[in-house]
From Swiss-Prot, chain A:
PANTHER family: INOSITOL MONOPHOSPHATASE, INOSITOL-1-MONOPHOSPHATASE-RELATED. InterPro entries: IMPase, Inositol_monoP_metal-BS, Inositol_monophosphatase-like, Inositol_monophosphatase_CS. The gene is INM2. Pfam families: Inositol_P. This is Inositol monophosphatase 2. Inhibited by Li(+) and Na(+). Belongs to the inositol monophosphatase superfamily. It is an enzyme of class 3 (hydrolase). Its EC number is 3.1.3.25.
From Swiss-Prot, chain B:
Mg(2+) 1 binds at residues 73, 92, 94. The gene is INM1. Its cofactor is Mg(2+). Keywords: Cytoplasm, Hydrolase, Lithium, Magnesium, Metal-binding, Nucleus. It comes from Saccharomyces cerevisiae (strain ATCC 204508 / S288c). This is Inositol monophosphatase 1. Inhibited by Li(+) and Na(+).
Amino acid sequence: MVLTRQVLEEVENTFIELLRSKIGPLVKSHAGTNFCSYDDKANGVDLVTALDKQIESIIKENLTAKYPSFKFIGEETYVKGVTKITNGPTFIVDPIDGTTNFIHGYPYSCTSLGLAEMGKPVVGVVFNPHLNQLFHASKGNGAFLNDQEIKVSKRPLILQKSLIALEGGSERTEGSQGNFDKKMNTYKNLLSESGAFVHGFRSAGSAAMNICYVASGMLDAYWEGGCWAWDVCAGWCILEEAGGIMVGGNCGEWNIPLDRRCYLAIRGGCESMEQKRFAESFWPHVAGELEY
Amino acid sequence: MTIDLASIEKFLCELATEKVGPIIKSKSGTQKDYDLKTGSRSVDIVTAIDKQVEKLIWESVKTQYPTFKFIGEESYVKGETVITDDPTFIIDPIDGTTNFVHDFPFSCTSLGLTVNKEPVVGVIYNPHINLLVSASKGNGMRVNNKDYDYKSKLESMGSLILNKSVVALQPGSAREGKNFQTKMATYEKLLSCDYGFVHGFRNLGSSAMTMAYIAMGYLDSYWDGGCYSWDVCAGWCILKEVGGRVVGANPGEWSIDVDNRTYLAVRGTINNESDEQTKYITDFWNCVDGHLKYD
């Protein structure tokens, strides 16, 4: 069975209601408090809060009650090597994206609720309660920011005139040509006059927020390695419904699965051929190949 | 002569919200033909709007404060424009012009005043997110015209420690040569687990907005070179009012002028103890790989 547009829209509205009435207020009221009570996840900068876990639990309870046959994948319950994205309808959820922002009170944390089917994102809702920005979309039904349809203004898409989202990431080990070194070298390539010489980079500290800003045309592209399916699923749907595309972060990867962990998001507001040329002009500046 | 700083702050707030803000918001993203700054690289974008807004600001402040000096980004002449002890408005009509051109919602107006070369009034207004941050010397800080309880905020933030901090960084528009290399090498050291191991870096593309966010307690510090007095003057005053501090970007530059062109801005701490700030600054400087130098 493939879900109809009407069902997708219903799921979208369920996400919106859940975020507006329950999750948003929780995230907003707790951001930037109790700094010392967080436990570290993979290393010193990958942070998990008790609230993150609690919120995921609330989301899971609500969604499985309403859609008991759908599968659920969340950041906090993910088990490496065990959790898999199948063809069935699957909720892919990040209770708090931008956890570091959340802990510091920097107003760019959000909740990201996505639904995938046949391994593709088909519903996405991203809510930043601090700035009251709610992005939402479902396949075939358009993309919206606070219930205003997202219409990306038409203009050329040129790498040398672009504003790109880049992040520091949580991998920090120098040397031996690891991902950290490749990322730093890629940033140099993109920024330098002898490289792409882009207009600038921005870092909001949240993959979902970055993708939504690309979707709305505020940014031209977002390049990142290391994020997970839950970081990108919702934003990916919003991006595509707004006319953008998602390709791989490594050279030549035009079609990637949701959990590829290495992404290049490119905005709409231009021809599809321009998007392809943008990717082709971007990829040579990627220093080496990111591996996850 | 005694200057009523609170009154000037109020005047600048109204100028920002009533006159400048609406222009920035309505014109953001509409500039298709960029006006390239003379002698600058293509990524340093000046729009006609920027110049018009500065003229509007200049006319408004001149009428109200005819004896005060004025320094603006658009009227600055290298080698000629100097900051004296006289009361001097230091103005960036649109900070974050690249954001402005791209309609990324973090362009703002930054209005500052120095007396005896010290920032004593600061007003920063981002009309896209309706955020007005202001302060005047001795009068604390206000967010959207309400006194901001920064002490509670600092309490919730905990200790100021480099490897628990979120740092704002900006590559700037100069993308070759020693300064660019120093910036990239320093970013790498700050992030690396062998050196700074900071929680992360952020960049929203506006120095003034960044300093406002530090004052609000959202970010811990901001390290940059290449910006001018008008980029930092307002933010500097606001930051000082909440216990923050501005030093140079290069090691050992504890005392700098507003036009130093390299800066490390650091947030306040709960007891406003200088030891914690001093240690943070020293640890940060240990990650600076090279030396930033601007004419």
